[in-house]
Amino acid sequence: MYRLLYPMRTFLVVSGNGEEADVMTADWLTVLSNKPFMIGVAVAPKRYTHKLIKKYGEFVISVPTLEMLKDVWIAGTKSGPSKLKDMNITLVDSKKVATKSIGEAVANLECKLVDEQIYGDHTFFVGEVLHYTYNEAAFRDNKPNLKYNFLAHVGLNEFATFEDKIHEM
């Protein structure tokens, strides 16, 4: 029944460090607070990312575009750090956390884990955003530039982008 809420924006969750670094695709993410800036992401306990977020107490949310679709697919269908060699991404130093950011992403939000709760078959990790970086052209005038083809997951292996048209009321 959760598919009734789709399409949903798709994100990449980076966790771990060094040889344990991992990237996972996630749709179940939401903003929880503006001040302080907090976001939450639901991760199943069987995911390698789950283990790393608990171990390191931090994670990075990266915002992919259509140009990163193959990497998004790999991150969502393969498990463990070995998948990074199949991906065409660059892990770059973050400013406030040890977990890396993704150089090709149009935005990276560096989070410190502040809470976690189990809801059914997922753990909801709450992160306080300590720092963020973004491509200024992709977020002009403090809103997304839809020409950057932000990804939304439709279901299974189907993704969509947003029409390059804003409807005003």
Predicted feature locations:
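Basic, polyanion-binding surface patches
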Residues: 1-169
